[in-house]
Amino acid sequence: MDKLERIELESQVCNELERFIGSGDKLLAEFVIGLADENPKLKDFNKAISENVPDFPESLSSHLFNLIEKMKKKTTTTTNNNNNNNNNNTNTAKTTTTTTTTTTTTNNNNYKESEWEETKLNSNSNNQKKNQFPGLSIPNKVEWDQGKIVDVPIDDEKTKEELKRKQQDMDREFEREQREKRDRDREQQNKRREIDKEPILYKIYDGKVSSINDYGCFVTLEGIAGRRDGLVHISQILSGRTKLNHPSDVVKRNQQVKVKILSVASSKISLSMKDVDQSTGRDLNPQQNIQSIISTNSTNNRSNPFKPNNNNNNSSNNNNNDDDDKYTTSKNRKRIASPDRWGYKQLIASGILSVPEMPNYDKEVGLVNHDEEQPEEDFDIERNEDEPQFLKGTRMNMQQLSPIKIVKKPNGSLQRAASTQTALSKERKEEKNQQRNEMMDSIPKDLSLPWHDPMPEAGERHLAQEIRSIAGQGIDTEIPEWKKVTQGSHIQYGKATSRSIKEQRESLPIFPLREAFLQAVSEHQLLVVIGETGSGKTTQMAQYLAEAGYGTRGKIGCTQPRRVAAMSVSKRVAEEFGCQLGQEVGYAIRFEDCTSPETIIKFMTDGILLRECLLDPNLSAYSVIILDEAHERTISTDVLFGLLKQALQRRPELKVLITSATLEAEKFSKYFMNAQLFIIPGRTFPVDIRYTKDPEADYLDASLITVMQIHLSEPPGDILLFLTGQEEIDAACQILYERMKSLGSNVPDLIILPVYSALPSEMQTKIFEPAPPGSRKVVIATNIAETSLTIDGIYYVIDPGFSKQKCFNPKNGMDSLVVAPISQAAARQRSGRAGRTGPGKCYRLYTESAFKNEMLASSIPEIQRTNLGNTVLTMKAMGINDLLNFDFMDPPPVQTLVSAMEQLYSLGALDEEGLLTRLGRKMAEFPLDPQLSKMLIASVDLGCSDEILTVVAMLSVQNVFYRPKEKQALADQKKAKFFQPEGDHLTLLNVYESWKNSKFSNPWCFENFVQARSLRRAQDVRKQLITIMDRYKLDIISAGRNYTKIQKAICSGFFANASKKDPNEGYKTLVEGQPVYIHPSSTLFNRNPDWVIYHELVMTTKEYMREVCTIDPKWLVELAPKFFKTSDPNKISKRKRKEKIEPLYDKYNDPNAWRPSKRK
């Protein structure tokens, strides 16, 4: 029995070695098991492995040790079962004594009884989740303390020498087996070379003439599997300028000839006899083959000069070319109707028409016979419902879980008001469209005629298009009058001040606390800093630490939740620090690194620091880490919380500062091991908070009425109004301006200033300027003004109680922006804005009951309401597999984690056990979404990585095209030049390649109405991605004009976004059957292909697909077999079951008369 268990253990280890390192050698497996027997501890086993096999991965050795121990435990449990049955009485006595001891220990514990019960409840809930979702609680393979060095006793020197001798013997045996294996492989390859499976381009074959026609002869090729015939055109038989009257003058039937393959298209092969010496078989025109190879190599080397010289992929690439040539050739053929084809036959028979003059004649192939083509069958696919091993039963358990809630009371007054405002917003859009249609109808009919004329005179259609574009876009592009008044003729940049930088720094609330702050940092390893917006904590703390000498031990890192904030803050600190940006003070954001070896203070996004944790979990390059704006609770910030807690335990000298603008002090302090709080007192004054008596149905109208009442009846002081988004703010500004204008000139001036993230930072600076005497300003802003902006002079705040929040739907796997009530903490933060300059008032446009009963205590963190695919992939790459027990401040919902794991599994990043694959490891190295990473890596195998690099870079930027108001028709004409029938991705590729051919010139961009800044940004992103691909030896190959490869690569990453044309209207997604539509700006708008893939969905008046690409449905099953499968032809698919059969209209019978149940 022991021998059988030993054999099973050896086979298990062999399988793991084969899976991870590609060599399942039995001797190596026995050696590893022997080391595990000699070293019962994991640290000793890892050390023994590293000494004997230097390049052996530590994570693999830990995995093998756990596997061996697990197998050993199985054997010990089976042998001990009998002993347990015989010793029940003894075990009972031991249990009694153990229970007594445990009770005594518990009584002597310092923990409170309530804390003990709470811990017990949490452990029970965790155990329940573990049982329901075992795939989310996989043990972490790599422990953090495995890297510590363990001293080896002197007594083990003999053992070490024996192990080395064994290893040397194994190495010699392994090398011998590898030589024998290579010899066998070489012999098999030589045998395979004798007969080719497919014809090879430019190779010379022997053949026999099978038939002779007027335009050439057909030759049956030898040396290829199966029967293959090719055409030698009459022009390819004799070299020189000798003209043949008929091929029978040179060749005879059954004659042996030597031919060279010129091209392979579908099943048609084009051959040449004149390029081959018929006696010796020598290639008389080798230059053609050489030039094609040189051009291919030059293209690849130009794209990536550092790529490895790997010739093993040639055969696979050739096969891909053959398959794609079939698709391209069949697509480009011109089909002739059967009556026309009969007429052509009659003309040829009468001698009026020659064969080369036929429309379906090809110089290389000859006549293309469309009769051979069969009509395409209706290809139906459906979702693959097979669950991986690590997610077995999770879908059933997910149905029992409650959905993600971002609203406390879905039927409350606040939620009803949000729904009403959404309906009113749609009404405003419809009213705008109606105005546009009325303007279109007002155009003279005679000017519209050239637009409908298929063959207009030169210039007529251009004039009509200009008029139509002015009518169609004039409402949208014309600058409203309120904007003209607000912006004025002169714009001042920045907050006007006459004080020096030193005086500005000393005027901040944090300056008097400088010494106390440094003292607190030196005494505590972790510090939670609470300070309101404008206290100076972001710009000053890092400088205080650098001045105190913390920058000599390592960098001072400061994270920001937004890229714009990281760049702007670093510029300000560099100015105060007295250095050039990028030297002592720098910043790092995605695809942009503005630092140097001299950098002391480094500002970065929280995502950048998370990626640095992937490479160095200890963050050894930093002496201090500042997590700024932690109250915003982004996904990366929440993950960094848990990682930094672990890093603090491993590095006692590391200092971590958590800053927040809200007073969630107890929560942060409790999570960070009762960390010390450092509070920066702000300039706060009392605020009078007022509620409405009844709920407001239209909060936008109520807000504007409140603004006018304050302006007409309250003392001087500026107003701050919170709304949800750009569209709502613009509508409010327009309505408010018209209402104030209708009051006449006797009313004091009201300056209307909008603020939202889409506005340039230079345009937002007007809100900081004081209003002129005798006037008042109203700032209408999103929740960006809650904490990120400090506006002086605000005495009145109007809070409708809503904001836009990103919410993830695990059912369809998409994020969406929804209008939802704010939290109580956000409401307090908004009211606090009125007490910065003096005593103020806050008008809450909801009832006090709604504040207490319908608002959550604090905002839901982003990690609990958004997609976690990228986050889970990063954590898996760090070795964190136990996601349920990871130390999150607020754990994400289980259904969101399961959805992320399913997505990564379908992309091939996870295996059947939920562990990271080699593909997943590569995907984690790219700073991209998992779909884009998979698309980029798959393009290497498909032979189109050069083009996909460009597509990914162009997708990362926005607003490539622009349409100036006065030249909209010309801009549309220029844009149409770049259109590709395959879709928007190829259109973006065409734009970049055209810009590249113009030597990246700015005049070309201006001429073609393309944003030069966006293209330069895409160029920088592309260079960064090329650097990562070079680092991991990924080839950069160009597909040329073969767009099928590019479409396949896009499909390999975004297969979940596939949609099929709906017979009634628009499209329906394959995953959920959701109705979607192609965006009007798309290349494929009004073309309506049957199958498409989209990059993202945008919700305006409809669910629009943006960046759309056509696909072949067969690719979905081929490239994503874990996600899609072909429907069973013997059964009705789920999609067809949902379709309703509508009979043809029959005025004499009932519509349901055809049903068997209705028949008599």
Curated annotation (Swiss-Prot):
Motif DEAH box mapped to chain: 628-631
Gene3D superfamilies according to UniProt: 1.20.120.1080, Nucleic acid-binding proteins (2.40.50.140), P-loop containing nucleotide triphosphate hydrolases (3.40.50.300)
Alphabetical UniProt keywords: ATP-binding, Helicase, Hydrolase, mRNA processing, mRNA splicing, Nucleotide-binding, Nucleus, Spliceosome
GO molecular function terms listed in the Swiss-Prot or TrEMBL record: ATP binding; ATP hydrolysis activity; RNA binding; RNA helicase activity
Listed CDD domains: DEXHc_DHX8, S1_DHX8_helicase, SF2_C_RHA
PROSITE patterns: DEAH_ATP_HELICASE, HELICASE_ATP_BIND_1, HELICASE_CTER, S1
GN (gene name): dhx8
InterPro entries from the UniProt entry: DEAD-box_helicase_OB_fold (IPR011709), DEAD/DEAH_box_helicase_dom (IPR011545), DHX8/Prp22_DEXHc (IPR044762), DNA/RNA_helicase_DEAH_CS (IPR002464), HA2_WH (IPR048333), Helicase-assoc_dom (IPR007502), Helicase_ATP-bd (IPR014001), Helicase_C-like (IPR001650)
Compositionally biased residues, Low complexity: 76-110, 122-132, 294-320
Name of the molecule in the record: ATP-dependent RNA helicase dhx8
EC id: 3.6.4.13
GO CC terms in record: catalytic step 2 spliceosome; spliceosomal complex
Binding-site residues, ATP: 531-538
Family matches, as SUPFAM superfamilies: Nucleic acid-binding proteins, P-loop containing nucleoside triphosphate hydrolases
Domain of life, source organism: Eukaryota
TM ranges: none
One Pfam family hit: DEAD
Residue ranges constituting the Helicase C-terminal domain according to the UniProt record: 699-879
Catalyzed reaction equations: ATP + H2O = ADP + phosphate + H(+)
GO-annotated biological processes: mRNA splicing, via spliceosome
Function in brief: Facilitates nuclear export of spliced mRNA by releasing the RNA from the spliceosome.
Biased composition (Polar residues): 412-424
SMART domains: DEXDc (SM00487), HA2 (SM00847), HELICc (SM00490), S1 (SM00316)
Membership in a protein family: Belongs to the DEAD box helicase family. DEAH subfamily. DDX8/PRP22 sub-subfamily.
Region listing for Disordered, in residue ranges: 75-140, 153-192, 294-334, 409-438
First-listed, main subcellular location of the protein, grouped into a coarse class: nucleus
Domain S1 motif span(s) in chain numbering: 202-274
